[in-house]
UniProtKB/Swiss-Prot annotation:
Stretches with biased composition (Polar residues): 271-280, 497-509
Disordered as annotated region, ranges: 142-336, 481-611, 866-912
UniProt-recorded name of the protein: PHD finger protein 20
Upper taxonomic lineage: Eukaryota, Metazoa, Chordata, Craniata, Vertebrata
Zinc finger regions, C2H2-type: 452-477
Keyword Phosphoprotein appears in the UniProt entry: yes
Amino acid sequence: MTKHPPNRRGISFEVGAQLEARDRLKNWYPAHIEDIDYEEGKVLIHFKRWNHRYDEWFCWDSPYLRPLEKIQLRKEGLHEEDGSSEFQINEQVLACWSDCRFYPAKVTAVNKDGTYTVKFYDGVVQTVKHIHVKAFSKDQNIVGNARPKETDHKSLSSSPDKREKFKEQRKATVNVKKDKEDKPLKTEKRPKQPDKEGKLICSEKGKVSEKSLPKNEKEDKENISENDREYSGDAQVDKKPENDIVKSPQENLREPKRKRGRPPSIAPTAVDSNSQTLQPITLELRRRKISKGCEVPLKRPRLDKNSSQEKSKNYSENTDKDLSRRRSSRLSTNGTHEILDPDLVVSDLVDTDPLQDTLSSTKESEEGQLKSALEAGQVSSALTCHSFGDGSGAAGLELNCPSMGENTMKTEPTSPLVELQEISTVEVTNTFKKTDDFGSSNAPAVDLDHKFRCKVVDCLKFFRKAKLLHYHMKYFHGMEKSLEPEESPGKRHVQTRGPSASDKPSQETLTRKRVSASSPTTKDKEKNKEKKFKEFVRVKPKKKKKKKKKTKPECPCSEEISDTSQEPSPPKAFAVTRCGSSHKPGVHMSPQLHGPESGHHKGKVKALEEDNLSESSSESFLWSDDEYGQDVDVTTNPDEELDGDDRYDFEVVRCICEVQEENDFMIQCEECQCWQHGVCMGLLEENVPEKYTCYVCQDPPGQRPGFKYWYDKEWLSRGHMHGLAFLEENYSHQNAKKIVATHQLLGDVQRVIEVLHGLQLKMSILQSREHPDLPLWCQPWKQHSGEGRSHFRNIPVTDTRSKEEAPSYRTLNGAVEKPRPLALPLPRSVEESYITSEHCYQKPRAYYPAVEQKLVVETRGSALDDAVNPLHENGDDSLSPRLGWPLDQDRSKGDSDPKPGSPKVKEYVSKKALPEEAPARKLLDRGGEGLLSSQHQWQFNLLTHVESLQDEVTHRMDSIEKELDVLESWLDYTGELEPPEPLARLPQLKHCIKQLLMDLGKVQQIALCCST
């Protein structure tokens, strides 16, 4: 009896109709109807991109079938009721971004379905629903913690009333600040108190302005976006050279307040010390900030690119756009909290005497030691000038240089202009502050062995290594990136260029800052400005290179000189960052300093010798996106400064882990200049070899010469090729997925061919018992790998191996089966690299081109069973099918093929093999020849390995079939359920290939003409 299909909205019951169906795992997939059974009332559903063996019959009224697009029952009625759209084209609105926050945008189109096409303030165009668009209000806070910039200044009105209102608000703000200006002078005469009082002082100073100022500032910043056109041509332009040096610290102090949710006393505190010059500075700063853009979450790379471009216009043209883009992956630990706690910087600089008054009795005794150290330093300044990265020891002694000694114990309050200059200089030069931002300063001296402390409030954990702190922060506190661990002295002196890069709160270093900032001449301002820009454009501190370990101990006093001169030339910066910790003669007399705000001890001098190499074991995970978005001053590594910005485009990470990520300790090959993760290569900071070449440059056997340059073939891994400029559409960009999928498929086929070649060589050994390589199989395969090869499925050595002195093994590409002594196995450290690695992720399954030649076949099958038939005649026919090892167990251990040498497999062999070998054993016993018995065991071991490889080849062939299904689903056939006949398209294909060859010939001729 023929049934009629039901009338289901959105589903047409005909062959080829598109719909969605739910499989037995309760997942919904796009599918189409393959067949219809009108007798049973069922439809055969084919899930797209799945094999036809997964086709399933559904009743046509099944709830597990649904239309592709969800039915919008009320959409039409709602639109008819609405009538006109709420917003018009070119209207300024607030549109919801993917982070569920509203950002300024402009309506570019009103769609018929009730959606709006909007262009966000940073240029991103997106279609949003009407419920995600609301009216733009200039007086409201757009986002709680992230107030974006407003780029569409033309659409904002600038009425005279608002300008007058803005001026009145600004005058009121300045009056409040002037009332608070004398507060530091009054508090300087307070008696000595615990360090927590320093924080109270800082908060008291900004208490009044804390309530009134931030609101005014927010309104000012919103209003100034309307008036920046008028003010850009006013007197503020004339004062720009004078105030340029002040703008950046102000800017840095304000941005984190909103971005990180800092207390609102941060900006008022900074404003207190700058009150005299605030009025002209504020407008100029805000005008510049709006043109540069306040950072907004999730769009930070785009804004950073804009900020770097603006700075390039002001200073020089050599900044690359992708510096900002690659900045987050390159920046390391140093300087993570330079901007995070600006209130600490302000409290240190504004309260000169309170800074000293709040020092504990421990600090007094340390000052006495410093005075004696000062007298000794007058005799020999070179002896006591140390790199600033040396922790408190260096900080306590570096004051003794003659150039700095004159103002060592300076405690008199400075003028607001000088204090303003100090703030700017500290923000420009003190690029990395390594203070502990949380904690009290009256804590006892910490054990010198503990170098890394958890920065979470109320957590008192200390760690000896950066990676331990990293794990603690990630798994105990649930923070992906830790706040800022204290770094080893070696790391400090390598990564530091600022005057107090390690001891910002200490009084001595503060005095040094004052010396360099006490003469606010135009020349110094220009130098500071120039240096700030130079540090900004070099935003990519490189991971440690092996060479640094040998050349670090150079000219310990050069940083002192560079700090006072503020010259931004690359050689000087190189000298600054290369100051070595081994030249610190007065380490024993350097006191442990307490900063009034931190209270943690910076100098871990005792462990200096053992840690001067551990410079980057925790570099990458400390730069969060919030710091990345800010306009911070960062320095760069000396190797990078010498080489210039040209190096940025040519630095390549090529590691066996296949992860294009720069983190932790990295080492660079001296030949190919590629970087590898130290932990992946089994190298730590302590055991860096004198001469290092990567595994690729060592020309391992079986590797093609072009393998060294695989990383340059992005068109293979990403599918993007360079096209001709005059073409509007690039073919590779349109078909990138197809190119990549095809390349992966070819790579898998090539790997299977290589493994099959190795299997043929092994089976040639199995053909005769007199083969010279047969004794190499006296032990089962993988006898070696019981302990150390737990992740060895990803390491090249994949073929025959035994316990003898000269076992055979398959070469890197699996194609050569020439037995050789196992003299060059991969190091144990390499094998265990992902056990002890700091990478907190599982290694991705990468396709070709992979760095290491892993075995690409994984499970059972019988692709080459016919070739093994001669062996089945020898009595092994009962063994071969039954000794397919339980590969799932082995795979759970991380190995690609079974390990008959492991204890479980041995037990398995003893239980399984020996009873079933009974017929052959009887024959051998009759002959009484021990040689035949041993030969049979050798063949048995080899046969076991061959069968496991055959199984894996079959499994890989199944996966290749799936890949082919995916590629076939991308064919541009029209309407049919099956792809067109390939032979029908053969003439067209030939013609295309001929045309392509002709075009390539022309391109070759053009290239020859151009080269000659």
